[in-house]
Amino acid sequence: MSLNASWAQRFQDAIPFGSSTCSKTAKYAPDEPAVIVRGQGCRVWDADGREFIDFRNSLGPVTLGYRFPAVDEAIRRQLESGVIFGHPHPLECEVAELICQVIPCAQQARFLKTGGEAVAACIRIARAITGRDHVIQIGYNG
C-alpha cells in the first residue's frame, strides 16, 4: 500500500468523510492525492513524492505560493517576538493604517477572528444603517 493510500485510510477512519473541509474530501476529487506533505512556489508534493501544480492555492490563502521568501522571513521575525497576545500589538495598528491608505473610503479597519464573526458584524452594521430586519443570504462556506 502506498503512503498516500495509507493516509487516505487513516483520514477515513479518524475524520468523517476523510476531511474536515468538504471541498478537500476525496469524494469530490478521487484522482487527487489524499495528503499533501510539502509545498514550494505553486507546486505541492504528496506522501509518495509525486509533484503537482496547486491550482487550488490552498483554497485561497496562498496567493504568493508556498514558502514565499518575504512571507517566511516575516513569520520567522514574528515568531521570535511571540504570537497571539491578549493585548494589541503594533503590527495590528500598522496593518489597519495601511488598509486605510490603500482603500480610499476606509476610515478605520477592524480585525475579527473568523469569517463567521466578520459576516455577523457586517449584517449588524447593514441592519443598523438601513433600518431593515431581513437579510437574504446564499453562498459557499468551505
Task: Annotate each predicted stretch with a short phrase.
Residues 20, 40-41, 64-69:
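Short capping/connector residues at structural and topological boundaries
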Residues 29, 41, 60-61:
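Short active-site-proximal "capping" loops at secondary-structure junctions
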Residues 34-54:
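Active-site and channel-lining beta-strand-loop segments
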Residues 2-10, 45-50, 100-101:
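Short, hydrophobic/aliphatic alpha-helical segments
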Residues 51-134:
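Glycine-rich loop-to-alpha-helix module at the N-terminal edge of alpha/beta enzyme cores
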Residues 1-38:
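Active-site-adjacent loop/helix segments that line or gate small-molecule/cofactor pockets in enzymes
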Residues 138-142:
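Substrate-binding/gating loop at the entrance of the active-site cleft, primarily
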Residues 15-16, 45-47, 70-71:
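Short, flexible segments with low predicted structural confidence
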